[in-house]
Amino acid sequence: MPIQKFPPMSKNFPSFDCDAHVVESALTWERAEDNLTREELSALKKSIWYDSTTGQMTVNGTMSAGISGLPVTAGAINPGSVAGPGMKHPIQRAINVRNLKAGTAITKEQATYLDHRGAYEPKARLKDMDIQGIDQVMIIPTDIDTYPWIQDGPGAAALCKMYNEWAWEYCQEDPERIFFAAMLPLQDPASAVRELYRVADKGCRVGLVRPIDAMGNYPLQPKYDGLWRAMQETGVVYGMHPFPAFGSLKPAGYTEQHSPSELINKTLSSSGIPHVFLTNVQNFQSEASVWLISALLSGLFERFPALNAAIFEASSTWLSFVLDECDKFYKLYRNERSMAPLKQLPSETFFERCVTGFEGDEAPPSRMPDFYEDILVWASDVYHHDGDDVWRALETMHKANLSEDRQAKFLGGNARRAYNIPAPKNFIRHRVTEIERPDWWPTQSEIDIAMKAESSVFAPPKPTIGNPSKRAAGGEK
């Protein structure tokens, strides 16, 4: 069997992954009847339901909706569950290039191997965490572009309760290592408050909010003040998680723009640019920056002085520019405000009350440690296709000569402080340097060919498929 090898690495502190994902699958839905009342289950089925027999999700009467629970099929990898241990981006690229041709496409058995069970099952996740150097993790659902569009308030509340109960049960496999961020039914603010108190009693530390204006429900409106008060009282962090604005479940005739990233998607589409992932360069940051500027300059954090927030999956390099601009424009126009004056500069509020996520290949934060000292929290984004392990983040930090004290803060300490979570009694110190792989694993020559730009468009030279070697490709030199 081929062996994928990695250079030895070590760390002397526990890590905390502030934003990793589970994939909502049949395992999530099969607990609905046990965790919901009869009335809640009825409301759920009328609004959103997953049929385990057909593998189809129905949302607001629309069949085959949503992006979670994708079936494992030959010739495709699941982008929501592929980034398990050692699944580096060049390997994913090589397999995607294989899938361009029927003759080289992966089989269903091979696709199942790449569909990492940790995205659905906690025992498998804990094993993967040991390899990936992840000591503690905050799990977040995947299908956050679907849920804000559920039309019925009771149905949305039932969905959130169903997911949150399943996520809590998932965490019980090792409650010192796995934590969950709760979904909240913003369609009905009163239900969102009740659900927040309920999950807080279960030890939940984060309430998730998608910063979009779905059905006129942008999460800064006065009708949500009760929710922010509840977050203050419970200490639950306002978890702001953006996403590309597909908007596939917008009601017929709904023409309002619901997200800044919707404009980005339309711009690329009208320009004839075919690759959907090109929008990711701007989508996440656009939703996050619009929310942050609005929250800071509207005085949200001054009206709720014990409210704390975390920005997820938006990178962090843009933040220094945005905070500088917020300070500059507040100074310029504060005498023209029709709102109450702020008690301190927007940047000062952010540094006191917020943290921002970053992923391991994002280099600028490690070069600007004074700015990010207390606000930076690492995210793996595992098991999504762009996810990676703590060792990748450490490589980036080592190149910037970042001190070990700051490595410890960025990779765990800041997140635990923000969430008020204690460090684990034990933690992973040394990297796993070898992973046994199946015979069909991509060879290095195949990866080299796949990484050429033309490989995604033109037929590449025929690589050798399934040729085992003593060392599997895709490790690190």
Give short role names for the model-derived ranges.
Residues 21, 26, 142, 212, ...:
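Flexible loop residues that form catalytic
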Residues 158, 171-179, 184, 189-190, ...:
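Catalytic pocket-lining loop regions of alpha/beta-barrel enzymes
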Residues 20-21, 381-382:
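Active-site metal-binding loops of divalent metal-dependent hydrolases
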Residues 2-14, 25-136, 165-173, 194-198, ...:
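Mid-to-C-terminal alpha-helical segments outside catalytic/metal-binding sites
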Residues 108-117, 127-151, 177-185, 205-212:
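Divalent metal-dependent hydrolysis catalytic cores, especially in the metallo-beta-lactamase
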Residues 15-19:
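Short, hydrophobic/glycine-enriched beta-strand segments
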Residues 151-153, 324-327, 399:
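A short secondary-structure junction motif
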Residues 152-157, 393-396:
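Short glycine-enriched, charge-decorated loop/helix-capping segments at active-site entrances
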